[in-house]
Amino acid sequence: MSKFLSQAALNTLRNTRLGSRQLVRSFKGISNTRNHRIPAHQESGCGHSVGCGLLELRMPVACRRSMFIQTQDTPNPESLKFLPGVDVLGKGNTYDFPNGTTAHNSPLAKLLFRVEGVKGVFFGADFVTISKQEGAEWSLIKPEVFAVIMDFFASGLPVLNDAQPNADTEILEDDDETVMMIKELLDTRIRPTVQEDGGDIVFMGYEGGVVKLKMQGSCSSCPSSIVTLKNGVQNMLQFYIPEVESVEQVFDEADRMIESEFERFEKNLKTLKQQEPSGGGPH
């Protein structure tokens, strides 16, 4: 996430620094600078070919088209970004599924969690981020994920049932000027960069100079997530908004439950290994 800290970027920020009220207005309309969409070409037939990290998967003849699914590495080695070349949730929308029990409202997420080794699923505007279990092999997971994504988009089913747009950075009537600026900065400068890495950052609150944020997708379990928050996000917020003293990563109840379950599982596994008889027969 050193992209947050480049001198050129800070110089640009200094040159464009505005008053607090002007700042809120100036952020509106700034869009992502990167386009991941990949065109689909009209074809018939079926089959697949692999080359240079790009997998071509052809839909059934009835669909009369091909889907090109590209993968992109993320800062987290346990997460991989899949770009199907079509909108997943549409511009500005994201949805996080940290485990299979949270996938009840998404037919696509349910199918992806059936792939052995998949630990988490995250949907972005035009990408799907898959987080794998530790020790699982991408060489085994990727082909199945490709097939699931291709078949799903050929089916025409909705990615989400009863989908709700992101509301964490929506400007509310009771938001003061500081909160408004924080939300605008997150939406226009910070969130697009994080989403390029296959994750998202969600505004959870602001109190006493502390901005509370939640990391999602590839960023949620990334080893550098704390560094990203402190050296990247915090620096940018403080540069524009002097009222911000620090940034804090928060975890919701679901995160704590998952962490607790993993700790319990690891403890039981360690106990079982200790109880196993040592190798070698009686002397």
Swiss-Prot record:
Gene3D superfamilies reported for this sequence: Fe-S cluster assembly (FSCA), Scaffold protein Nfu/NifU, N-terminal domain
SMART domains: Nfu_N
Keyword tags: Iron, Iron-sulfur, Metal-binding, Mitochondrion, Transit peptide
Subcellular location: Mitochondrion
Binding positions ([4Fe-4S] cluster): C219, C222
Ranges for region NifU: 182-250
Domain of life of the source: Eukaryota
Organelle targeting sequence: 1-65
One function term, GO molecular function aspect: iron ion binding
GO biological process: iron-sulfur cluster assembly; protein maturation
InterPro entries listed in its UniProt record: FSCA_dom_sf (IPR034904), Nfu/NifU_N (IPR014824), Nfu/NifU_N_sf (IPR036498), NIF_FeS_clus_asmbl_NifU_C (IPR001075), RNA-helicase_DEAD-box_CS (IPR000629)
GO CC list: mitochondrial matrix; mitochondrion
Family the UniProt entry places it in: Belongs to the NifU family.
Entry function: Molecular scaffold for [Fe-S] cluster assembly of mitochondrial iron-sulfur proteins.
Protein name: NFU1 iron-sulfur cluster scaffold homolog, mitochondrial
